[in-house]
Amino acid sequence: SIGTGYDLSSTTFSPDGRVFQVEYAAKAVDNSGTALGLRVKDGVVLAVEKLLVSKMLVPNTNRRIHTVDRHCGLAMSGLVADGRQLVSRGRAEATSYREFYGTDISGKVLNERLSNFVQLYSLYGSVRPFGTSVILGCVDKNGPQLYMIEPSGISWGYFGVAIGKGARAAKTEIEKLKLSEMTAREAIKEAAKIIYSVHDDAKDKAFELELSWVCEETGNLHKFVPKDLLEEAEKYAKQALEEEEDMSEEED
């Protein structure tokens, strides 16, 4: 069906019930740096492999992880500008909820409102779908919450999730973890290890690891991981990779 005209508009279904423009938007995510979220017993950890296109970039700029509300973080994969639009919308929703109800927005409600907003952009010929998937991590009165929203507007709740070019390999690694027994501090190291292990050195040379957490240790506020902890996690990740490489060489 591709190339027969059914892929010209996001308002057109193909004969087999597919909307190609939405599928193409998902391809933008599949070609982007990996992002993942881990929901553990005391909070949520978000990690992103931010691919660096130039050595001239200032460190810690063009972030892929943002704070949507004081207790909620958002990690994105795909087109960064589209992701920023969702961050702005998320912040507006969180602010209006607090003004109206006098309390913080729950992860479930924020996820519903954002996914409805994303889905609207697949209904009209005058707009295009968002070329980004986002992972929402919150801690509210119901405990840690983790959601992922796709360009189609579909969203699910997760214990662990990955998006981007290394998503499949990352999911395999996430499934090996005992997330319900893990603390956020431990999860930071594992998240760093997974991002380093799925990074493709052959295709993408340089990348910057972004890590954030919202947990009991941060007072249930979304914050970027402190520099010393980030460096410790990166060291752990590199050591673990070297050990795995040594073991595979010995087996050969």
Curated annotation (Swiss-Prot):
Q: Which UniProt keywords apply?
A: Cytoplasm, Nucleus, Proteasome
Is tRNA processing there in the keyword field?
Answer: no
Q: Where in the cell is it found?
A: Cytoplasm; Nucleus
**GO BP field:** proteasomal protein catabolic process; ubiquitin-dependent protein catabolic process
Q: Which CDD domains match?
A: proteasome_alpha_type_3
Q: Which family does it belong to?
A: Belongs to the peptidase T1A family.
Q: What does this protein do?
A: The proteasome is a multicatalytic proteinase complex which is characterized by its ability to cleave peptides with Arg, Phe, Tyr, Leu, and Glu adjacent to the leaving group at neutral or slightly basic pH. The proteasome has an ATP-dependent proteolytic activity.
SUBUNIT field: The 26S proteasome consists of a 20S proteasome core and two 19S regulatory subunits. The 20S proteasome core is composed of 28 subunits that are arranged in four stacked rings, resulting in a barrel-shaped structure. The two end rings are each formed by seven alpha subunits, and the two central rings are each formed by seven beta subunits. The catalytic chamber with the active sites is on the inside of the barrel.
Family matches, as PANTHER family: PROTEASOME SUBUNIT ALPHA/BETA
Output this protein's name.
Proteasome subunit alpha type-3
